[in-house]
């Protein structure tokens, strides 16, 4: 029975303690994000990387602190459900005029679900649905720190206004030639506008927070004229002389989607009202789910919450069944999907055939490494869930048999909540964006005649371009991973996927290593004919030894694939290439990475990146 009166002072005290816990969390999160500006101004790239890793751990630490306080001060796990119903209602009252209500609701869920039995995970006790609207919260924000600022240039004053817009961010380091950069941005904006009349509402809007990631920061906003809006971003980098430059102007949803890709590290942004940032960014990228925008802003737990709500909504409005995912089955992961839903679900198997030598804990550690690392646009982000329930009726019997065979410890089939509905409960699962596996992408092109030089049909020519594009992108992905100090371990085509933007992304993490932990060697010269003809490895191989020249037999069996690979990426088969980058990283060098095409850059001369394309 839902309470008609709030008469429990204990319930209020518990709610207040949880609100205090959330406010402490967001204060620390925001402080660390705001410090990114100083780290950028002092070119403290290693500090930026450390802060990125540390900030990811903040949420779980604060949840644990709050849970322990509730147990210690209020014996929270011993309180009756009547009290817990009132706790939620008091908490809702505390959210009135709060600037991060959606994050605070999620924090409440994270703490409460550590205390209550799963049968109480319903809207009476936790926030299954949001209770407080996030619309127009920014109407109450300080005039001195709005979510976004507006500028009203004329055709003649656009460059001058752009200069002022950049200076208003108060970066404490000089620009090499801001006037020249502003003139380039102006020219690009005029080209975007085309031959149109400037309307009464012609304006520039920019979000007040700078977006920091890697060695760059980004000014993000819109150019508005009449009924047209042009999303844009301005990357700000260090030039050769240690002075700042605007390196490009990115326009339109596709460029912004690349910048905010799920395969990139999270931004650091100082935000008073994160929902206002998400709403603004969503207006620029309407195809991007809100959960992925929260993730990109470093608010991963909110991203998980919204993803799960979207997933439940999709299940309610679809009828297809979960199935074993298409493609070559993995030795470590059992992968399944729902055809109508653009994600895959990955469960760690209970056992791994030779030559795999790993454990569940080691695999989880690899996935955590990727979560905390700079993914440079080449490693897919993952969402990690525990005790996830699916309707049994929606599971293909073949998939159930596969789970029972390879991951029985991770599977429970029961009426967990006692409501008469049988569920498939997965103890631990990773969820990733679905991509086309690169081996399937290439095979489709082979089947269309792309590797046959005698086939000159239009379909074969398109297929040949597909092969070339896939192989070049694969090599670029490997080089980008090198720049991020990542060695994939298993480099087979099947462990990489193609995104909707045509980028190759790595997604199989159980064998990854830091480049700096590997020893890259040439295969020794055979001592005699017997060694040369031997099918066995006759030389000593250490546990972290890598022989790049041995990649070729596994990757380059097709002559056309080999031709393209050797033309663009032959150095990947040379141990000296890998070893030289290892030594630079060990010496403290941090590579430049660019989430946009090299052709868009105003200052290509400042790059030390070894990749001649975007990442």
From Swiss-Prot:
It is found in: Cytoplasm. Keywords: ATP-binding, Cytoplasm, Glyoxylate bypass, Hydrolase, Kinase, Nucleotide-binding, Protein phosphatase, Serine/threonine-protein kinase, Transferase, Tricarboxylic acid cycle. GO terms for cellular component: cytoplasm. The keyword Cytoplasm applies. ATP binds at residues 325-331, 346. Its EC number is 2.7.11.5, 3.1.3.-. InterPro entries: AceK_kinase, AceK_regulatory, Isocitrate_DH_AceK. GO terms for molecular function: [isocitrate dehydrogenase (NADP+)] kinase activity; AMP binding; ATP binding; phosphoprotein phosphatase activity; protein serine/threonine kinase activity. The keyword DNA-binding does not apply. It catalyses: L-seryl-[isocitrate dehydrogenase] + ATP = O-phospho-L-seryl-[isocitrate dehydrogenase] + ADP + H(+). The active site is at 381. Transmembrane segments: none annotated. GO terms for biological process: glucose metabolic process; glyoxylate cycle; tricarboxylic acid cycle. Bifunctional enzyme which can phosphorylate or dephosphorylate isocitrate dehydrogenase (IDH) on a specific serine residue. This is a regulatory mechanism which enables bacteria to bypass the Krebs cycle via the glyoxylate shunt in response to the source of carbon. When bacteria are grown on glucose, IDH is fully active and unphosphorylated, but when grown on acetate or ethanol, the activity of IDH declines drastically concomitant with its phosphorylation. Belongs to the AceK family. This is Isocitrate dehydrogenase kinase/phosphatase. It comes from Albidiferax ferrireducens (strain ATCC BAA-621 / DSM 15236 / T118) (Rhodoferax ferrireducens). The lineage of its organism: Bacteria, Pseudomonadati, Pseudomonadota, Betaproteobacteria, Burkholderiales. The gene is aceK.
């Amino acid at each position: 029975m839902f309470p008609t009166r709030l008469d429990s002072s204990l319930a209020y005290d518990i709610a207040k303690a949880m609100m205090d816990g959330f406010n402490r969390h967001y204060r620390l999160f925001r402080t660390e994000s705001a410090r990114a500006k100083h780290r950028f101004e002092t070119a403290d790239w290693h500090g930026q990387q450390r802060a990125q890793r540390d900030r990811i751990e903040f949420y779980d630490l604060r949840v644990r602190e709050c849970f322990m306080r509730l147990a210690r001060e209020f014996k929270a796990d011993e309180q009756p459900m009547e009290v817990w119903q009132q706790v939620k209602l008091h908490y809702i009252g505390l959210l009135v005029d709060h600037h991060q209500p959606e994050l605070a609701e999620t924090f409440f869920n994270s703490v409460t679900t550590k205390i209550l039995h799963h049968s109480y995970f319903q809207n009476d006790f936790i926030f299954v649905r949001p209770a407080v609207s996030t619309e127009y919260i920014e109407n109450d924000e300080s005039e001195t720190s709005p979510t976004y600022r507006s500028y009203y240039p004329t055709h003649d004053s656009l460059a001058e206004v752009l200069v002022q817009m950049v200076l208003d961010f108060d970066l404490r380091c000089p620009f090499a030639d801001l006037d020249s950069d502003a003139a380039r941005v102006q020219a690009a904006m005029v080209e975007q506008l085309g031959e149109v009349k400037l309307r009464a509402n012609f304006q520039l809007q920019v979000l007040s927070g700078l977006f920091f990631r890697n060695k760059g920061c980004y000014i993000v906003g819109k150019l508005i004229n009449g009924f047209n809006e042009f999303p844009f971003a301005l990357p700000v980098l260090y030039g050769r002389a240690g002075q700042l430059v605007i390196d490009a102007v990115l326009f339109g949803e596709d460029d912004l989607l690349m910048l905010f890709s799920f395969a990139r590290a999270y931004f650091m942004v100082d935000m008073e009202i994160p929902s206002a940032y998400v709403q603004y960014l969503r207006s620029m990228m309407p195809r991007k789910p809100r959960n992925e925008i929260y993730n990109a802003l470093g608010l991963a737990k909110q991203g998980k919450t919204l993803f799960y709500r979207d997933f439940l909504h999709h299940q309610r409005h679809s009828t297809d069944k979960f199935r074993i995912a298409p493609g070559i089955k993995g030795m470590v992961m059992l992968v399944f999907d729902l055809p109508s839903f653009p994600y895959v679900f990955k469960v760690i198997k209970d056992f791994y055939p030779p030559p795999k030598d790993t454990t569940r804990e080691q695999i989880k550690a690899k996935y955590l490494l990727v979560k905390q690392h700079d993914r440079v646009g080449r490693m897919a982000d993952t969402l990690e869930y525990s005790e996830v329930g699916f309707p049994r009726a929606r599971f293909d019997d073949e998939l159930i048999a596969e789970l029972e065979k390879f991951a029985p410890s991770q599977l429970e089939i029961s009426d967990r909540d006692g409501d008469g509905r049988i569920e498939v409960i997965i103890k631990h699962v990773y969820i990733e964006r679905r991509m086309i596996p690169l081996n399937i992408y290439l095979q489709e092109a082979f089947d269309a005649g792309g590797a046959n030089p005698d086939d000159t049909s239009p379909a074969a020519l398109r297929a040949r371009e597909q092969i070339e594009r896939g192989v070049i992108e694969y090599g670029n992905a490997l080089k980008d991973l090198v720049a991020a100090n990542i060695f994939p371990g298993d480099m087979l085509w099947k462990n990489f996927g193609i995104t909707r933007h045509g980028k190759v992304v790595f997604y199989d993490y159980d064998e990854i290593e830091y480049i700096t932990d590997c020893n890259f060697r040439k295969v020794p010269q055979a001592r005699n004919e017997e060694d040369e003809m031997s099918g066995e490895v006759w030389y000593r191989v250490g546990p972290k030894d890598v022989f790049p020249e041995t990649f070729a037999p596994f990757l380059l069996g097709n002559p056309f694939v080999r031709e393209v690979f050797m033309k663009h990426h032959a150095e990947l088969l040379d141990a000296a290439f890998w070893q030289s980058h290892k030594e630079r990283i060990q010496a403290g060098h941090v590579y430049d990475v660019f989430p946009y095409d090299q052709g868009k850059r105003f200052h290509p001369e400042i790059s030390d990146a070894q990749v001649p394309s975007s990442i």
